[in-house]
Amino acid sequence: YIMSFDLTSLYPSIIRQVNISPETIVGQFKLHPLGEYINKTAPRPSDEYSCSPNGWMYRKDVDGVIPVEIAKVFYQRKEWKNKMMGAKRNQELIKKVLNDKKFGTIDKFTEVNVYEDFSDDMKAELLTYTEECLDKLMFECKHAEILGNTNQLNRKILINSLYGALGNIYFRYYDLRNASAITLFGQMAIQWIERKVN
């Protein structure tokens, strides 16, 4: 069998979950081979701190600046993605009415938030619009979908590129310990899944 797994925003999720940020590092612990952590045979270094596979420990009691900012952008992305999907679903409804070729006489559509799924009243109202009116509404929905997609992709790139920035010596929050903690956590997650599946 061949399987494909997509771990949603893996590195940003690791940063948030472990609270990886320069000001949250508290110290180191004795390392064990990565396989021992995957098999849960390595001793648990600390219950008080989040521990990374590269030996660094992070505070849990205070949110780090990097995880906080990633969370903000992550939720903005989710919001824009939902808007994009709403506009896309609305296009399908309009397309169905256009394909049925049974048009009404109303030539101006009601002001509606095209990012949100059309209400039942709006769905019924679609049947009363002229073809030109439906085309205009379709244009609005397509524009909203493109805007939503652009915004969610921009945020995806922003949060995913932050990991690379952490390993860049010119970045204000550069810290190789953090960059390697994220990488090793990612490797551990993939290897853990591989062992569970196999």
Model features per residue range: what roles?
Residues 1-198:
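Conserved acidic
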